[in-house]
Amino acid sequence: MKRTFQPSVLKRKRAHGFRARMATVNGRKVLARRRAKGRKVLSA
């Protein structure tokens, strides 16, 4: 069986990047939660 994680920076940024998070209301909620928790890194 092949390894299922085949990294791609482009796909990672498009799916989980800061701009992707900011694009939707729920994404903004994700960022707000991570800020509230005190995460050093908010998004990919």
UniProtKB/Swiss-Prot annotation:
Disulfide bonds: none annotated. One of its GO terms (biological process) is translation. Pfam families: Ribosomal_L34. Keywords: Ribonucleoprotein, Ribosomal protein. Belongs to the bacterial ribosomal protein bL34 family. PANTHER family: LARGE RIBOSOMAL SUBUNIT PROTEIN BL34M (PTHR14503:SF4), MITOCHONDRIAL RIBOSOMAL PROTEIN 34 FAMILY MEMBER (PTHR14503). This is Large ribosomal subunit protein bL34.
